Structures are given as C-alpha cells and as structure tokens.
Amino acid sequence: MSAKSRRPGTASSQTPNECVQVVVRCRPMSNRERSEGSPEVVNVYPNRGVVELQNVVDANKEQRKVFTYDAAYDASASQTTLYHEVVFPLVSSVLEGFNGCIFAYGQTGTGKTFTMEGVRGNDDLMGIIPRTFEQIWLHINRTENFQFLVDVSYLEIYMEELRDLLKPNSKHLEVRERGSGVYVPNLHAINCKSVDDMIRVMKVGNKNRTVGFTNMNEHSSRSHAIFMIKIEMCDTETNTIKVGKLNLIDLAGSERQSKTGASAERLKEASKINLALSSLGNVISALAESSPHVPYRDSKLTRLLQDSLGGNSKTIMIANIGPSNYNYNETLTTLRYASRAKSIQNQPIKNEDPQDAKLKEYQEEIERLKRLIAPQQQQRSEKQGTIKKQRVKKPKKEPISQELIGSALQASSADLQVDEDRDSDGDGAESESDKENEAEVAKSNEELERERVENAKLAAKLAELEGQLVRGGKNLLDTYSERQIELEKKLVEIAERKKREIEIQQQLELQEETTLEIRERNVSLEQEVELKKRKLSKCYAKYLALQQELNDCKHDHNQDLRELEMAQNELVKELKRQLLIIDNFVPIEVKQRLYTQAKYDEEQEEWKFSSFPLPLPPSGGDGRQGYRRPVSHPQRRRPTSEHALQEAKSNAPSSLRFKSENIVSYELEMPCRTTQEYRTPKVSASLQAVLAQAMQTGGDDIDIVDSHTNSLRSRLENIINANSSSNGGPGSGAGPLAANTAGSGVGSMPNVRNIKSSRGLPSAGTALDSNRRPPTGRIPAKKPASAYPKARGLVNK
C-alpha cells in the first residue's frame, strides 16, 4: 500500500492500521442520455483525485459539491491503467500472505460488471478479475523454492440467499463465524493449475448467475457475486506456510422502480438489492463514525464483508458513477458513501502457518503414501527374484524325461508295456512336482498383481496430490521475458509515484490558504483590500458549500430519523400487542417457563427454546396438577373475547372460527312436500252468477223464522220482479204470483213453498245455460238458503 492509504489513526504495535482505499470511476455518456439531451453534472480531475458535482437545475441555490478520494478516473481511463495503478499492489500483498478485497459499488448501469469482469475475448477491455488471474500465475511461475495450492470458489447472494454458482443444485448455504473470520461451510472449491482453469471456472459461474433486463441496463445483475481465491504458499527450504485470500465482489446496483420500470419478480429483486446496499451503507456510516455497534448482521452481504470492512483485510472500494443529470441524486449518494468509507480503518495481518491450511495436509499425506509404497516395492523386488530362480530349475527336468522316452522306444516289444508303465509313473511324479511349482508361481503372481494394483492406486493418489501442488520457478522463459518483468516493475513504480503526487497535491491545496498571507507581500492598501476580498469570496464560497452540505445532512438525518421512528413505533405496537395476548391468554407458569428457556441464536438470528423437557405445573388444592386459568375469563373452557361471543351466536359462515367447540350449526332443512292445497271444483260462469246473486243478503243475514215473514216476503218480491223483468219486461208473469202472494196469509210459510213448487223451478243439480232463456211461464226462483252448503251457517244463525 502507498503511504497515502495509511492515514493518521490508531496503529497496532505489529501491523499499522490501513484505511480503505477508495477510487471513483465515471463512465461515459450513454447513447440514450445523449439523445435525450441530458447535461453532464460530473467533473473529474484525475491528477488531484477530485470529483465535482453540480446541480444544473438549482445552480443558483446550490454550490458545487467537491469530493476528494485516493484516485479518480474519468471516462477516458483504460482498464489497464486502472488495474496497474490501483489493483496490482493489492494482489501483490495477497501473494505475500495478506487478505484482500476489491468490490465495485454504485448505481445500476454505471459499469460495475464491466470494471470487474470486462469484455470477453478482448485483451484491452479485460476486467479486474481476469487480470488478477494472470498476475497470480506470473508470480507463481517466476517464484523458486515454493509450492503453491490455488483454490477458487464462486457464489452469489440472490434474494438474501446464498447460492453456489459452481454447483447450482447444491443445498442451502449459511454464513458461519469462527476465530479466523467469516466463512461459508459446504462451499464447493475447485483446484486450479493455470490461468485457463480459473477463466473456465469464472465462465461456468457467470452462466449460472442471475441477470435480467431493466430500462436502465439490458444485462442488469440481479445478485451480488463473490469470486473467492485462496492461495497457499509453502517455502520448501524453511517449510513455512502462508495463506492469502482475495475476494473479488461485483455488487448489484441500487435502483429506483420509477426509472428501471421493474415489476413482478424484478421488483422483488430490486427491493432485496436495495435492502442489502442500505445495510452496507449503514455499516460504512457506523465504521466511519466509530460507532460501538456495527450492524454486520443486517444482511448476508455485510456478514461476508465483515473482514473486509474494519477487519483483517486490505480493501479497495471502486465507486462507479454516471455523469448525467438524470442520475444526480444517485450519484450524490454514491459519492457521499464513498467519502465516508475513506475513514474506515482495517487491521491487515499476514496469515502465517494457519491451522486449516490444505497444503500442510497434502504434504503430510504425500509423505505417508511414500512410506507405504517404499516397503511394498522392496518386497515386490524380492519376490520377483525368487520367482526367477524357480523358473530356472524347471527346464532341467525336461532332458531326463526325453532319455526315459528314448530308452523305452529302444526296448523290446515284450517289455514295452512294462517300460511304458514305469515311464508313466515317473512322468506322473514329475508332473505333480511341476504342478506344485506352477501353483506357487501363480499364487505369487496373484499376490504381486494385487500389490501392483495397490501400488498403482497409491501412486495415482500420490501423483494427484503432487499435481495439485504447483512448484514455482517453471516455464518462466516460455511465459514472460525478462524485459516484460522489468516493464511491469516500472509500471508499479510509476503507479506509486502517481499516488505520491496526488497526495502531495492534496496537501498543497490544504496548506495553500494558511500560507497565502506569508507568501504574498502587500504593497499598498488597495492591494490588501483586493486580497482580502478574494479571500473573503473564497471563504464565503466554502461557507455556502458547508452550509449546503449541512442542510443536506440534516435532511438525510431527519429522513432517516423519521423512518427509524416509524419502524420503532411499529415494533413497539407489535410488542405491546404480543405482551397483551401473553398476559391475558397464557398461564403465568407457562409464560415464566418460556422466558427462562428462550435463548437467542446469533448464527441463525432468531430465538430458540431449549430441548430439555418441561417441568410439570404446580398442583392445585385438590391434589391434581394443572394450570391456573388466564385472567381473561377463569370460568370458560378457553379464553374468549366479547366479539367472539357475539359472533358465535350468529350462524353466518364467517362465525365458524368463533365457535367454542368447533361444531358447525346449520338451519333445519325441510323435506319435499308430498301434499297439495285443496281446490274447489270449477263452476260454470252462469251458475256462479246465480249463486253469487243468491248469496247477496243486502247487508243482513237470512233468518227464516216466523217473526221475520215481512222481510222475507219483500225480498221474495224483489227476486220475482227482477226475474220477471229479465224475461218479459216489467209486470209480465207477475200477476198470478202476486195474486197468490197477496191472497195468502202474511205469516204462512206453506204459501212460500206452494209458490216455488207451482213454478216448476229446476233442481240444484241441473245445469243452466246463460244463452238459453227459461221456458215460458216458468220464472226461476231462488232456492232457500238451506239448499246451498255455504249458506247453511247463515240459515242456522
């Protein structure tokens, strides 16, 4: 690190503290911004490390905002310049045994992925990650008397979940913490032996990374990607081991829904991304203000960056910004957070002889395998010597058998059979001895074959372990020439010199005002007044800038305070509600036992209960063990509110959840009707008219008694007159009836019967047609009330 990165601060007795190195890079204007005519609001001065931001909308009200960083690069800066001046020294420190971290921070669409990964297939546009691979293997190839073990891992944080990009279908990953720092167990690591292997791993991970389309970026990263490189180095002369770890982080950009047009799944991703970046901003603010509590556990991203921010690491933060006025607010926020990160101090420590170094384990395993193979090879050589001796003795018996066969052929024919039997016995004895020797040889060959297979397996395992260890100092002339190595050294020296120049320039600007009066001599009062005016104008401009900065800080502070107050009010309200439920619906013994058994798990960030069995509740007055009823209602079987009681009385579908016994009550369902209403038989219209006229009593009931003969006579006359008028006009056929009526006694009922019978009226069952007139001389008369069923009641009355 340069001297400029070691700002004043507390220093350890062993290793001085180092501040986070902050670099700002501004991308060029996009085609869309040019077509829309958006003005540029960012001015970058690389020779001083200064970035100026001007609000063109309120140029009269707001002053230019000036920010100073360790380095600043405009749109014309190349990838090679950025790497050699900023990243190259950090990677060299990692190769010496330190921990390093490089992460790109900024708004979406500002070139973070381009800075970290670059363009594939173009050497000039390669990003930081592939250039890091080349520097690592260049160092390995030209370092002698060292063994190296290089492992790489690749993961992403998507929707606050860790995913292994090298094993997409792996199980869920968690962040753990131990004495040496934060780590991710069960993360797949791949051993690499060259630059091509590391590039191949990076391509595999990039294919599995989550990207999406937004209005601000066609290939927007929807997750935070972390490429981890672990380099173990062993000095073969002193047998000391050093471990360097490098984390290359490509953060997803912060975004606003109104600008990106995110919806559905993209909107959920944006909310999680903004939440993680907000947590990162809170961590940076807490570290910059030396707060006693740093909220590392607010997100998975801050947990993984715990060592990089304020821990055992050398860190570079590359803040990417856009020059357009369209992104003014986002650019201002990024510059402020980057300015705060300058004051974060880390404590880098060289990792020497770590306990978890794989290189040490591999060396011990190689020595063990060599010790196993050596005696087996010696035993194998001894067995091969004995087998050769046995094979030499075997051919000596063959001439003996040939002589016996020759003598048997020269014998007589009489003794031929005897000689053949003897020869066969001799051949059988020799064949048995040969078979025994062959069995021993076969057995020895089998044992040797098994040992050979075992030795081959051990040798293959040994070769595999030795193959993973890369020995330095090989193929140096084939990779880089001496002139190229010297050129790289010169580039590093130039980068260091440029950093020192920027530091000196910044110090001169700070001391310029204090030395202004000493350097300038006043000749007259007018010149003194002019100098005072210029000094006053500068001071006033600084005052306005500081006042604007103070107002912005107050606005941001008030906004954060309001958000915190709202969150606190919601939490307090929820806490009171939960406590109210516990106090009124949970027995006191249960509540006390739960409070004593609850433990907070810092790894899982949640409360858990101990697994030991719960004690029995205290016994009551009757000797039975049981809980006391809650204070809500001790008589009921369960606590019930007044609203639940009212709802339980109703039979609405929504009231089922308020039933105390969980029994559904329904209305009675009536069966289908099997009977019908009685309907009177239909009567013809003419008969209905006659019956209706007969039933008209004129307001009085028909009383057929001796005391009402006068009324009965008058009514009968009215009926007869009406019938006569309808048949033959007035007075027709009325003479005989009137005479008979007049001549009869007034109260004599038999006279009425005589009148009805003398006219020959039809019976009740005879149907009358309304179109047919009754026969001449017959006047229809009304029957007595007793003849009609409906009139019987009137007659009785």
UniProtKB/Swiss-Prot annotation:
Residue ranges constituting the Kinesin motor domain according to the UniProt record: 19-344
Report which residue ranges the record marks as coiled coil.
350-384, 432-580
Q: Which GO terms describe its cellular component?
A: cytoplasm; microtubule; microtubule associated complex
Biased composition annotated in UniProt, kind: Basic and acidic residues: 432-450
PROSITE patterns linked: KINESIN_MOTOR_1, KINESIN_MOTOR_2
Keyword Coiled coil carried by entry = yes
Residues at which ATP binds: G106, Q107, T108, G109, T110, G111, K112, T113
- Name the keywords, alphabetized: ATP-binding, Coiled coil, Cytoplasm, Cytoskeleton, Microtubule, Motor protein, Nucleotide-binding
Q: Which intervals carry biased composition (Low complexity)?
A: 782-791
Give the family this protein belongs to, as stated in its UniProt record: Belongs to the TRAFAC class myosin-kinesin ATPase superfamily. Kinesin family. Kinesin II subfamily.
This protein is called what? Answer: Kinesin-like protein Klp68D
- The encoding gene: Klp68D
